[in-house]
Amino acid sequence: MYVQDTIAAISTPTGEGGVGIIRVSGRHVLSIADAIFKRNRDGGLQSHRFYYGAIIDPVSADCLDEVMVVFMKGPHSYTREDVLEIQCHGGYLVVQRILDLVLQQGTRLAGPGEFTKRAFLNGRIDLVQAEAIIDVIRSKTEKSLALAQHQREGLLSQRIARVKDGIVSSLALIEAFIDFPEEDIDVLGIQQVGAHVDCSLTELETLLAGFNEGKVLRDGVSVVIAGKPNVGKSSLLNTLLREKRAIVTSVPGTTRDLIEEVVTIKGLPVKLLDTAGIRESDDRVEREGIKLSLDKIPSADLVLFIIDSSLPFSSEDQAILDVLAPCNFIVVMNKSDICRSFDMPQLPDVPIIAVSTLTGDGIDALQDAIFEAFIHNHAVDSREYVAVSQARHRDALQKSRDALLRFRGNLVAGMELDLLAIDLRDALSAIGEVTGETTADDVLDLIFQRFCIGK
């Protein structure tokens, strides 16, 4: 449990705005409203109704601002406690003065994510849904927002609940065999246990298989644009950004520093890095830029290898291709509007896309190829699509899966029932780490510290 005091914080961004909101949660919100909120009509505040009035300092009788106030009676509120929200004008000083006045009434300034933490501790949401709230706030694309919304709505929690139900059913049968040793353990009972575990394992494997796509949709990917000088790397960056971000000239070696920009490609957050042209150079500054380019390639999620298709495939192209051999890359043959002058080496399983940054031909196909390099599940646009997107969830689900696999092996080996029950309890505990049922307090603190104050 937690100290059930009354907390308050500003819930809107700092600075000028149309509206500022101060949120208060706890058992004393009505007495606070009585002390500082004045309106023309008598009577108490009814739940879930807006009231117009003014915030008055009870000591000086100064009017701080005209406001709208809404009271939400627990448990029908965000935190499941009594909640008061004060909506005032959005200037920094106005909002801060009202918060200070609220704090003077015996409330405490809320910590980061403390309102959401109370919603979790009071059973309104589980930990998966709580973490999804911050993902909703931080989403940069439609697909990452949809994934976060589905998690917030409980779709992932429902899938995890199915895993838990199978483990609980198996554990109940095993413990029944332990508690009633006089009853013979029949083959049908063991088969029933195995069937429950197999269903949970299948669900776990499905969830884990979707982690890479879920993480990509949530966090995005890094894509390096690489190639020799003057093949159109900066032109491609500008084309994908739909703006002139990089200088484009006919002089080889114009780009010497890394240029980094973020763009959305088919709903996927992509960090693009335009790099210096890779070649042998006597220029010290250019050599440093080339070194930076080569250093970025191994850590990239994807490399776009740009080739000038109007020129013969050169030894410089081959040298870059050799560097890219262990990487995930797409060959982009630029200047497709000019007659092609070379034959590409055979590259099995490597997408080769012809584009023209001058005319825009092939850019849609390139964007499709970038998206499909990471997302293979066409259900990502479904209203029911849900995926594991956080490493914490993946790690806990892997622990649960490993415990179930261990149980499976021990069951076949004829191990004692007490040992089998330990495996199932381990699997159940790992599942509880995801939803927050068995999560350590220090882990909870770290999770909610990622939130802003006021949420």
From Swiss-Prot:
GO molecular function: GTP binding; GTPase activity; metal ion binding
Lineage: Bacteria, Pseudomonadati, Thermodesulfobacteriota, Desulfuromonadia, Geobacterales
Family classification: Belongs to the TRAFAC class TrmE-Era-EngA-EngB-Septin-like GTPase superfamily. TrmE GTPase family.
PROSITE patterns, per the entry: G_TRME (PS51709)
CDD domains: trmE, TrmE_N
Organism: Geotalea uraniireducens (strain Rf4)
Function description: Exhibits a very high intrinsic GTPase hydrolysis rate. Involved in the addition of a carboxymethylaminomethyl (cmnm) group at the wobble position (U34) of certain tRNAs, forming tRNA-cmnm(5)s(2)U34.
Subunit structure, interactors included: Homodimer. Heterotetramer of two MnmE and two MnmG subunits.
Protein name per Swiss-Prot or TrEMBL: tRNA modification GTPase MnmE
